[in-house]
């Protein structure tokens, strides 16, 4: 099958279209013909080798972390899906590879595609949708009337997280560039800060939750926004010892993560704030919840551009510019 493959770790020039064998099908697996996949920041982080300590992949590797497509075949223990079903998913960490014509996915990681979305729109949802759900619903337990600050409101996670937080009844603040202010307000944000003109920590106070998708440099400023008892939740690091425990990482690696996260954990603790690192995981059941919200009109995916599979490298480069509004899609079929 045709796929976008990396043979070594490196920056933008790494990766090419080539041939790989079709995936094996285990008893509880579903073989999906991929129609569309989406680009995530995680793809570039995997390609560069930035996360190889916590996600040790064997090369050559097919990149790609979410998709939408059609069921081709199911394993003998699969009961929820049958050939012809239109589905979407974020595969498990150790079984990525959606920039390809086929993928084998665990039944429990898969969900039926929202009926009101195209394949391209559906492919834009799984990773960012699950990230927003696991941060806001699972970890933050966001309630109506609470205040949440979502960094980078026009990005892939931001566009979904704003809509989910509004559905949950929260007051939502976010940041974006000058040209996107009105557009992000239209997604539902109550307060939009133009980061080119204002510093968020000078404007925002007494927030319950901050969702940070940016670098470590904004984490300390984010602490100033939160009230005592608030939660600073980062999806971009630094990872914590708790995360190492969940991932089953080695003792030495756990100590490394303890060191790299020590500074922000200590500063948060001094302010009575809880710091959590969230690395989203695959979940078909949560995707079904998200699908219901999409079908009800509470969440609308945002697609910026669509590239053909042969232009996957260009799609990755475009996302790397930071200019995409919402998600960038790779059309496979």
Residue ranges and their predicted role:
Residues 35-36, 74-76, 92-93, 153, ...:
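Short, surface-exposed secondary-structure boundary micro-motifs
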Residues 126-197:
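Mid-domain Rossmann-like dinucleotide-binding core that forms the NAD(H)/NADP(H) cofactor-binding site
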Residues 68-92:
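A glycine-/small-residue-rich N-terminal strand-loop-strand element
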Residues 80, 89-152:
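NAD(P)H dinucleotide-binding glycine-rich loop of Rossmann-like/cofactor-binding domains
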Residues 279-333:
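C-terminal hydrophobic helical "lid"/dimerization subdomain
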Residues 218-296, 332-333:
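Glycine-rich phosphate-binding loop and adjacent beta-alpha segment
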Residues 201-209:
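A short acidic, Gly/Pro-enriched loop at the edge of an enzyme's catalytic core
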Residues 11, 20-68:
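N-terminal glycine-rich beta->alpha transition that marks the start or flank
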């Amino acid at each position: 099958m045709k796929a976008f493959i990396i043979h070594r770790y490196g920056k933008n020039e790494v990766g090419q279209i080539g041939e790989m064998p079709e995936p094996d099908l285990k008893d509880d697996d579903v073989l999906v013909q991929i129609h569309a996949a989406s680009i995530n920041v995680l793809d570039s982080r995997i390609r560069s080798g930035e996360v190889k300590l916590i996600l040790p992949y064997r090369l050559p590797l097919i990149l790609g972390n979410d998709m939408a497509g059609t069921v081709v075949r199911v394993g003998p223990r699969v009961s929820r899906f049958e050939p012809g079903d239109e589905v979407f998913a974020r595969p498990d960490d150790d079984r990525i590879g959606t920039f390809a014509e086929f993928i084998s996915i665990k039944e429990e990681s898969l969900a039926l595609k929202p009926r009101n979305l195209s394949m391209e729109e559906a492919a834009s949802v799984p990773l960012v949708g699950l990230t927003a759900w696991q941060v806001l619903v699972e970890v933050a337990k966001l309630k109506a009337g609470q205040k949440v600050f979502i960094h980078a409101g026009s990005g892939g996670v931001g566009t979904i997280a704003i809509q989910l937080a509004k559905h949950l009844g929260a007051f939502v603040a976010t940041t974006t560039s000058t040209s996107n202010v009105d557009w992000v307000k239209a997604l539902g944000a109550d307060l939009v800060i133009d980061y080119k003109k204002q510093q968020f920590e000078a404007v925002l106070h007494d927030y319950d939750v901050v969702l940070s998708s940016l670098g470590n440099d904004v984490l300390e400023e984010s602490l100033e926004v939160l009230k005592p008892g608030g939660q600073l939740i980062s999806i971009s690091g630094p990872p914590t010892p708790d995360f190492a425990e969940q991932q089953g990482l080695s003792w030495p690696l756990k100590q490394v993560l303890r060191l790299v996260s020590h500074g922000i954990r200590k500063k948060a603790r001094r302010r009575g704030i809880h710091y959590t690192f969230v690395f989203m995981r695959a979940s078909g059941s949560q995707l079904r919840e998200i699908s219901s919200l999409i079908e009800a009109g509470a969440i609308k995916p945002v697609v910026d551009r669509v590239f053909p599979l042969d232009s996957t490298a260009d799609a990755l480069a475009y996302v790397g510019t930071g200019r995409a509004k919402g998600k960038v899609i790779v059309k496979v079929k």
